[in-house]
UniProtKB/Swiss-Prot annotation:
<comment type="similarity">
    <text>Belongs to the urease gamma subunit family.</text>
</comment>
<dbReference type="InterPro" id="IPR002026">
    <property type="entry name" value="Urease_gamma/gamma-beta_su"/>
</dbReference>
<keyword id="KW-0378">Hydrolase</keyword>
<dbReference type="InterPro" id="IPR036463">
    <property type="entry name" value="Urease_gamma_sf"/>
</dbReference>
<dbReference type="InterPro" id="IPR050069">
    <property type="entry name" value="Urease_subunit"/>
</dbReference>
<dbReference type="GO" id="GO:0009039">
    <property type="term" value="F:urease activity"/>
</dbReference>
<dbReference type="Pfam" id="PF00547">
    <property type="entry name" value="Urease_gamma"/>
</dbReference>
<comment type="subunit">
    <text>Heterotrimer of UreA (gamma), UreB (beta) and UreC (alpha) subunits. Three heterotrimers associate to form the active enzyme.</text>
</comment>
<dbReference type="InterPro" id="IPR012010">
    <property type="entry name" value="Urease_gamma"/>
</dbReference>
<keyword id="KW-0963">Cytoplasm</keyword>
<dbReference type="GO" id="GO:0016151">
    <property type="term" value="F:nickel cation binding"/>
</dbReference>
<protein>
    <recommendedName>
        <fullName>Urease subunit gamma</fullName>
        <ecNumber>3.5.1.5</ecNumber>
    </recommendedName>
</protein>
<dbReference type="GO" id="GO:0005737">
    <property type="term" value="C:cytoplasm"/>
</dbReference>
<dbReference type="GO" id="GO:0043419">
    <property type="term" value="P:urea catabolic process"/>
</dbReference>
<comment type="pathway">
    <text>Nitrogen metabolism; urea degradation; CO(2) and NH(3) from urea (urease route): step 1/1.</text>
</comment>
Amino acid sequence: MQLTPREVEKLMIYTLSDVAFKRKARGLKLNYPEAVSIITVTAMEGARDGKSVEDVMKEASQVLTKDDVMDGVADLIPNVQVEAIFTDGSRLVTVHDPIK
């Protein structure tokens, strides 16, 4: 299978988010890459599901709380940007203050 660098990056994000969701379900606190991957995948999947940009941003900003992440991780992530594929094309989605 021949994948573009962008497709390889998406696969890595989805793989890490799968691990992160499982760790979160076990009650483990997430580190920086795990938290970013969950926020990113939530945004990408919301877009793919046909949700509006506003709904995607809102959902992605509510998927994690400070209790879900290791100390200091929330402060390291002031925003997350991801190019998501919506039903009418791709858009850059910026999730501000994604961990509250």
